[in-house]
């Protein structure tokens, strides 16, 4: 079962539909309606932290989920979920170099893991004004995709299957978005 933690975002059910293409066992729970103990009892195979408004400190249980489950379950964070991973592991989240709401950017990626079989560069959909800051990226994380101006668009834990995507793979404006989701489902 994939647990999709909803950060009160309008894109959550787009993600649900994309994941539903590859698995029929998905449970959606709001970020303030579940505890670590309840997640342990559910015993999900994977955890997804959805996009959402505001900042990581406002994302309910998400940062606690990263800290508790990072060495136990594959975790994918998208947009706010990505920022939660960065901050939970010691990074800094602050204003992005530019505000991107409903805009497309070209990114370069490393072609491994979640990007396996996907050409580089690709165009992705961005809806954010905050970003994980490159200069404060914890040593346990590596950048696996970025924009031409160096903004982090994807990062991965060096030891555990914890991946953050600043962009929205579930948006029609993201090239190969379904393949990115499929790679997470099948690779991690």
Where are these regions (language model features)?
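Acyltransferase
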Residues: 171-188
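Structural signature of beta-strand start/N-cap positions in the alpha/beta core
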Residues: 1, 24-25, 45, 74-76, ...
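Short amphipathic alpha-helix with an adjacent loop that forms part of the alpha/beta core around
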Residues: 35-43
């Amino acid at each position: 079962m994939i647990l999709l933690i909803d950060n009160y975002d309008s894109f959550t059910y787009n993600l649900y539909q994309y994941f539903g293409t590859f698995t029929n066992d998905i449970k959606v729970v709001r970020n303030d309606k579940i505890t670590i103990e309840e997640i342990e009892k559910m015993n999900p195979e994977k955890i997804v932290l959805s996009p959402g408004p505001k900042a990581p400190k406002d994302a309910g249980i998400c940062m606690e989920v990263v800290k508790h489950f990072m060495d136990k379950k594959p975790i994918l964070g998208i947009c706010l979920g990505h920022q939660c991973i960065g901050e939970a592991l010691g990074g800094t989240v602050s204003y992005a170099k530019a505000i991107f709401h409903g805009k497309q950017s070209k990114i370069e990626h490393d072609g491994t893991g979640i990007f396996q079989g996907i050409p580089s560069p690709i165009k992705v959909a961005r809806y954010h004004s905050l970003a994980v800051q490159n200069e404060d990226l914890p040593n346990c994380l590596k950048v696996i995709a970025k924009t031409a101006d160096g903004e982090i668009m994807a990062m991965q834990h060096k030891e555990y299957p914890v991946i953050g995507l600043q962009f929205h793979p579930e948006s029609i404006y993201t090239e190969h978005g379904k393949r990115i989701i499929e790679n997470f489902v099948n690779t991690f």
